[in-house]
From Swiss-Prot:
The keyword Transferase applies. Residues 301-419 form the PARP alpha-helical domain. SUPFAM superfamilies: ADP-ribosylation (SSF56399), Domain of poly(ADP-ribose) polymerase (SSF47587), SAP domain (SSF68906), WGR domain-like (SSF142921). Residues 179-276 form the WGR domain. A motif (Nuclear localization signal) lies at residues 69-72. Residues 64-84 are annotated as: Disordered. InterPro entries: ARTD/PARP (IPR050800), Poly(ADP-ribose)pol_cat_dom (IPR012317), Poly(ADP-ribose)pol_reg_dom (IPR004102), Poly(ADP-ribose)pol_reg_dom_sf (IPR036616), SAP_dom (IPR003034), SAP_dom_sf (IPR036361), WGR_dom_sf (IPR036930), WGR_domain (IPR008893). GO terms for biological process: double-strand break repair. It holds the Pfam family WGR. This is Poly [ADP-ribose] polymerase 2.
Length: 653
């Protein structure tokens, strides 16, 4: 209950109750929780009970407020079914400190003035329910302050339950979860997650519909939950229905009401203004426990060499992938990474392509509409900030969202890979390793190859990238199955170079298993400075920046690839159609103002040039780039040679 409060707040509440305020935070929390429980019992004992009418069952103790029904505006109250009754005067009567405590307990920002905090609580879907009149809305904390009581809805650990193809919504009451599952009839799974973002109306909301069937058979319910993305929202359970057909009828009616699409024709789904969009889910074996035992145990028990095992456990970590995506705004709760479909990712690309077509026209209204479409297809959690702050209206914002969708594409591949249990699960790390279709050989630190790569890394760290240094954790020699054969036709091409490629940590299971790939036709060409291709650099730090490491996650992974360059089409400025190469040219080069001194390059025995010289200025090159970029439009020109695992050390400013 109180664990989310700061120590100072816990002590303040204890002091108000005349209780001991000494001790560590765990002791203080236990003391306050015990006092809250006693107060809670007194409130519940004195409160009237609520009765469900007809087929409407109150969920988690929520009361039907009778004639006090009113429809709330905003994301949370569109049902207008009277599940909660908002008492604004009660919020206004609270002290600022009490409002802050309530906001923190509801997961709402508690900064700003008193009016700001009240407005956030009123905007929150579940916030008003915490201060409703007329008795308990479930188990509550009661924090006494002076002559007032602040009722804070008690936080409860929620878990997802999977029985059958679909996961029961995590907020369905436990006594229902134990006895019910999501209805499946043949290939039809009666489970729908809907999303709607309207930038102009500041809406970013979800709607969940599920038909529940009792495990024993013969009893059916329809469950709804709705609210602003990022909060629990409100929920309602209809039933039990007399027949399965009646429950399906209610489900399909609600789906049509919210989307203006028929459930039976959802594969041809059309989006409508002010209506929800259906998020297509993958009902394969998702959410399964991929690992048996801890990572440490797996590393000890695997037949893999320890350094390889540690690297595989790093890049094949679903929790890491989820965290990386959450950091850049993606809502992994609403559309779990394991349920991503390729079709959803292509829809995201398609909307970004349409945004790129109008981004230079300064058509604000059109950009608002398209931005809403993008956030509807690719759910984001913006909390209660104004949606207009997140309009995709500049090339930089477009590129950031393009990189997000690319990362989701890699993760979609990775999650399917990691959920494949056809391999040897007695040694899960070895199974993951085999699924990458790559052979790894660790390089020893005293080897010539290691020394050469270390020099290449150190020498080509640009002066403009001075905010961090890196330490090499491990270097692997790598061979992707089938890549050498495809590269063979370019093996004798002159001008082959060893070049850098960096990417997010979450992308590497997908990249290594599938190879480096070119963006699909659905992606906007304007997001790529020299057209759609695979980009490389001869400066380590230029590629290292694309690892997007942080203080929270300092690990980064980069590739060194042999790239067949041949005759190059040199460009000083952006050219989105650069993939249409002039005759005789094999790839493009964006020419930078600083580049490794080619006189100091090393030539390997197989003729590959390693540009590891110290950087030098190229005064004659006055284009738009600080450093060189090499772009190939045919992946057969690429052969992976080395994988580097590094740690970033960020300098304090």
């Amino acid at each position: 209950m109180s664990a989310r409060l700061r120590v100072a707040d816990v002590r303040a509440e204890l002091q108000r109750r005349g209780l001991d305020v000494s001790g560590t935070k765990p002791a203080l929390v236990r003391r306050l929780d015990a006092a809250i429980c006693e107060a809670e019992k007194a409130v519940v004992a004195a409160a009237p009970t609520s009765v469900a009418n007809g087929y409407d069952v109150a969920v988690d103790g929520k009361r039907n407020c009778g004639n006090n029904k009113r429809k709330r505006s905003g994301d949370g109250g569109e049902e207008g079914n009277g599940d909660t009754c908002t008492d604004v005067t009660k919020l206004e009567g609270m002290s600022y400190r009490e409002l802050q405590g309530l906001a923190k307990a509801r997961g709402v920002a508690a900064n700003g003035g008193k009016k700001d905090v009240i407005q956030r609580l009123l905007s929150a879907t579940a916030g008003p329910a915490a201060v409703a009149d007329g008795g308990p809305l479930g188990a509550k904390e009661v924090i006494k302050g002076g002559d007032e009581e602040v009722e804070v809805k008690k936080e409860k650990m929620v878990t997802a339950t999977k029985k059958g193809a679909a996961v029961l919504d995590q907020h369905i009451p436990d006594h229902i979860k134990v006895n019910y599952h999501v209805l499946q009839v043949g290939d039809e799974i009666y489970d729908a997650t809907l999303n709607q973002t309207n930038v102009g109306d500041n809406n970013n909301k979800f709607y969940i519909i599920q038909v529940l069937e009792s495990d024993a058979g013969g009893s059916f319910m329809v469950y709804n939950r709705w609210g602003r993305v990022g909060v629990r929202g409100q929920d309602k359970l209809h039933g039990p229905s007399p027949t399965r057909d009646q429950a399906i009828y209610e489900f399909e009616g609600k789906f049509h009401n919210k989307t203006n699409n028929h459930w039976s024709d959802r594969k041809n789904f059309k989006c409508y203004a002010k209506k929800y969009t259906w998020l297509e889910m993958d009902y394969g074996e998702t959410e399964k426990e991929i690992e048996k035992g801890s990572i440490t145990d797996q590393i000890k028990e695997t037949k893999l060499e320890t350094r390889i095992a540690q690297f595989i456990s790093l890049i094949c970590n679903i929790s890491m992938m989820k965290q990386r995506m959450v950091e850049i705004g993606y809502n992994a709760e609403k559309l779990p990474l394991g349920k991503l479909r390729k079709a959803t990712i292509l829809k995201g690309y398609h909307v970004l392509k349409r945004i790129s077509d109008v981004i230079s026209k300064a058509d604000r209204r059109h950009l608002e509409q398209l931005t809403g479409e993008f956030y509807t297809v690719i759910p984001h959690d913006f909390g209660f900030r104004k949606m207009r702050e997140f309009i995709i209206d500049t090339p930089q914002k477009l590129k950031a969202k393009l990189e997000m969708v690319e990362a989701l594409g890699e993760i979609e591949i990775a999650t399917k890979l990691l959920e494949d249990d056809s391999s040897d699960q007695d040694d899960p790390l070895y199974a993951r390793y085999k699924q990458l279709h790559c052979d790894f050989t660790p390089l020893e630190a005293d080897s010539d190859e290691y020394s050469m790569i270390k020099s290449y890394l150190r020498n080509t760290h640009g002066k403009t990238h001075s905010g961090y240094t890196v330490d090499i954790v491990q270097i692997f020699k790598v061979s992707r199955h089938g890549e050498t054969e495809r590269f063979q036709k370019f093996a004798s091409t002159r001008n082959r170079m060893l070049l850098w490629h960096g990417s997010r940590l979450s992308n590497w299971a997908g990249i290594l298993s599938q190879g480096l790939r070119i963006a699909p036709p659905e992606a906007p060409v304007t997001g790529y400075m020299f057209g759609k291709g695979v980009y490389f650099a001869d400066m380590f730090s230029k590629s290292a920046n694309y690892c997007y490491a942080s203080e929270a996650c300092r690990s980064g992974v980069l590739l060194l690839c042999e790239v067949a360059l041949g005759d190059m089409n040199e460009l000083l400025n952006a050219d989105y159609d650069a993939n249409n190469l002039p005759k005789g040219k094999l790839r493009s080069k964006g020419v930078g103002q600083t580049a490794p001194n080619m006189v100091e390059s090393k030539v390997a025995d197989d003729g590959v040039v390693v540009p590891l010289g110290e950087p030098k200025q190229e005064p004659s090159k006055r284009g738009g780039l600080l450093y060189n970029e090499y772009i190939v439009y045919n992946v057969d020109q690429i052969r992976m040679r080395y994988v580097l695992h590094v740690n970033f050390n960020f300098k304090r400013r």
